[in-house]
């Protein structure tokens, strides 16, 4: 109840005494910030370094609330034993304020250096986008995506080609390129990627084909996201503890291990559909490469299990 939300779940994550445990890495949020705040992460780290140096030497001007707010929470998160990348989300506005203030007061030489850095980063983003589309999809993006990318990259690199206007290059040109890349990622890449999250795919399949949510049983170590899609708390049974009564005359979603368990119980079933599954939050190069992807995905099955025969066998003890 209240204690769990205000104490166990929060302080327990920091001390690693709660229900959710982790190992903790002191530098986890350092390298997470490097990619999560990209392409302004280099300017962000420079701004933090410069502000820290000014405060130590007591030469700081302007407000310091953003700086100390960021540093305090960043250190708390870094010392926590349980860490997730999205913990940084509330810190990004503070880091953006610090970074912008530093760039506005920076010398021309500094701005010139960062404008070059951002142009290089944008070039890498462009190459990365092309590589991602080629290896993962190998199809043309949607027409609206193509228009957005062409417009964003053209405007961005046009600004980069202009002499001077270093601050506009760092802020606006970079933003145009990044918005274009993010449009592609959310319009084309993520929708295709989510087809490999079998738990959500089976839920959409059930809704489309009018399969009752209360008739599905998830067998195996599955952290089902289907509950949200189906608006129903689904039943999850472990492979080692599943019994005939759990799956008799039910729809079952399971892995090859769960299928083998049903075979050992003597259950009869028909496979309705096979899904390809992969932990989509932990991407690998072999999975992204469509030529090696088949070896990385695991099949998951939606099956209709026949009613089990619970009759006790009659033993003929008649002596002849």
Predicted features and spans:
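Juxtamembrane membrane-water interface segments that cap and precede transmembrane helices
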Residues: 6-29
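Membrane-lumen/periplasm interface segments of specific transmembrane helices
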Residues: 1-4, 79
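Membrane-embedded architecture of ER/inner-membrane glycosylation machinery
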Residues: 50-320
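Residue-level signature of the transmembrane alpha-helical core
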Residues: 10, 33-34, 71
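Terminal, non-globular segments
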Residues: 45-49
